[in-house]
């Protein structure tokens, strides 16, 4: 593997304009802001970034802009959310010559799902044809992979190097940590980052990190330093923010939280609605509790 990404890895929001196009010049300000907060890596094109709405050209351009903005300061992970092995491979090939540390790949996520052998074959073909490290993004409710199946895939396909575990059940997370001790296990259980870290998570890739990167890095650092009193305090404040942003329009609520902390205002891609006035009020209050409202604006380079 080119690099083993660990620590706090925020999944970026994609900066859409009102006409639905990506405003690529606003990628760099977000990358710089997240790195400035102490983030250890960057993920683009995932669910927080509405990667499922991007066509192949947009996907390639977004990844290129993210890699260019990162300038090698932190590893970049490329999300892939598509419905077929063919399209997943195509996206992987679009970015394999960029400075991408790994692919973050969801299982196919339409109403029906492949059986276990077909799922193993899906990730095997991706690995064989892209030659890139793969992190399974275990998030799709109707195509959810058990710890046993995840472990089987990682054992049979060496380029599958880890899992981003996104269920709220810490028992599943703990089982996976125990069954795959030599693999990279990331938490995407936004409400439970603190216990995930104490269980030994290698890092996190979750929307809460993009909504409050400074506090999220502080939580990681506190657990690593053994300062559990401070970690618990941060956990409670971050949980209040998570409760404010978690909703069907989570990407919009995440980008609204970012805008309150200085990033340029951007939009979700239609038909996803923006944060409602009620959501905005609760998000603002939670960020105030974190001391995250600085009023400093982040400007895009011309």
Question: At which residue positions do the language-model features occur?
Answer:
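Active-site beta->alpha loop and helix N-cap motifs at the rims of alpha/beta catalytic domains
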Residues: 2-10, 14-142, 152-154, 297
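C-terminal alpha-helical cap/extension of soluble enzyme domains
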Residues: 4, 9-13, 37-39, 198-201, ...
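Short glycine-rich loop/turn motifs that provide flexible caps or phosphate-binding loops at active sites
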Residues: 6, 19, 40, 44-48, ...
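A general structural signal for well-ordered alpha-helical segments in protein cores
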Residues: 9, 27, 59, 63, ...
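Alpha-helix N-capping/helix-start residues
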Residues: 18, 24, 56, 147, ...
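Short secondary-structure transition/capping segments
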Residues: 54-57, 90, 115-118, 147-149, ...
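Short helix-capping segments at alpha-helix termini
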Residues: 68-74, 98-99, 129-132, 155-159, ...
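Catalytic alpha/beta core domains of metabolic enzymes, predominantly
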Residues: 125-128, 140-246
